[in-house]
Amino acid sequence: MGPLGFVAVGIGAAVGAWLRWGLSVMWNALNPALPYGTLAANLLGGYLIGLAVGFFDTHPGLPPEWRLLAITGFLGGLTTFSTFSSEALANLISGDYGWALLHLLSHLGGSLLFAALGLWTYRLLA
């Protein structure tokens, strides 16, 4: 990867992280047991990765820096497995097993579902 790839990943990651932080600031306090901002970031990221995979698979001639910017950078910064894991662990430690299970299913199942919906949307529109 050349210097432009590093710049693309860095810019994308910064923008994705800022969006994730903004969603957390706006919505996490509404339900600390299932922080909606983190969930929104992961579901949105899942949907957008589906769109991006569909787009980049049908546009193989694009410079690789665009994929690095969008997928590795932006979506890597937006989605947050480490935050998701710490929130699930907090539920488990406090004995909130039902919330922990809902948290796990919402993020994992929801992200997979939204990724499939994103790919389906792209294929429908392409």
Curated annotation (Swiss-Prot):
One cellular component term (GO) for this entry is: plasma membrane
List of residues binding Na(+): G76, T79
The terms under GO molecular function for this entry are:
fluoride channel activity; metal ion binding
Q: How does it sit in the membrane?
A: Multi-pass membrane protein
InterPro entries attached to this UniProt entry: FluC (IPR003691)
Activity regulation, in the record's words, is:
Na(+) is not transported, but it plays an essential structural role and its presence is essential for fluoride channel function.
- List keywords of the entry alphabetically: Cell inner membrane, Cell membrane, Ion channel, Ion transport, Membrane, Metal-binding, Sodium, Transmembrane, Transmembrane helix, Transport
Name of the protein in question: Fluoride-specific ion channel FluC
Organism of derivation: Cupriavidus pinatubonensis (strain JMP 134 / LMG 1197)
As recorded in Swiss-Prot or TrEMBL, the protein's gene is named: fluC
